[in-house]
Amino acid sequence: SLAFRQGMIAIASGIYDMVIIGGVEKMAHDSTERVTEGIASAADSLLEVGIGATFPSLFALIANRYFHEYGDVREAMAVAAVQNHANAYLNPDAQLRKLITVDDVKNGLPVADPFTVYDCSLVSDGAVFIVLAASDIAEKLNPKRAVKILGSGHAGDTLTTYGKKSLTTLAATVKAADQAYKMSGKSAKEIDLVELHDCFTITQVI
């Protein structure tokens, strides 16, 4: 998403009239232990990873805090997992095409309370590349598939769980969304499709 925003800004500023942005992730070839260690490097190496914390355990802390403040939302988390698997089932190129039920999620292999295996995203390989172009060029190249960018936002927050003001909201997401709404002149009620980062089902609920 940051590459997308930087590409958009580069075109809007007139520095470039066309850019290609991309992202690549290759993790499925390695062991679970190595991948877990690699992902955990995004957390605090001393006060979180140093005491054995992993991303599933850190997000489990977030989930339990959410339960404490707003009540148990395991049902909503399970529904999110079922929905995501149903979407994947419709895609012949999906990594895991398997329909599951709410009971499957709740009774799945435990990972970090309250998560079962179905609450956690898969370790995956993937890549995406997008061509961004100035409006006049995009219209000439492929007018039927050109998508206009109305708004964009970007914000940051601490990656540490202990450094956040609240564990039950994604502050950077809220700020970035507000920026995008303001820039586009649109509101949440006018959005028909949203793609969410769902590393764990609790993030989708939040």
What are these regions (language model features)?
Residues 19-24, 75-82, 144-153, 188-197:
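Beta-strand segments within the central parallel beta-sheet cores of soluble alpha/beta enzyme folds
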Residues 5, 75, 87-91, 99-101, ...:
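Metallocofactor- and cofactor-centric catalytic cores in central/energy metabolism, strongly enriched
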Residues 1-19, 26-58, 96-122, 157, ...:
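Conserved catalytic cysteine-centered active-site region
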Residues 45, 78-79, 110-179, 183:
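Condensing-enzyme catalytic core mediating Claisen C-C bond formation in acyl metabolism
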Residues 161-166, 198-206:
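Short glycine/threonine-rich loop-to-helix capping motif typified by GTGT followed
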Residues 1-25, 57-90, 130-136:
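Active-site-proximal alpha-helical scaffold in enzymes
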Residues 3, 7, 11, 129, ...:
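Stable alpha-helical structural segments in soluble proteins, enriched in small hydrophobic residues
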Residues 67-71, 176-190:
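Phosphate/pyrophosphate-binding loops at sites that engage ATP/ADP/AMP, CoA/4′-phosphopantetheine
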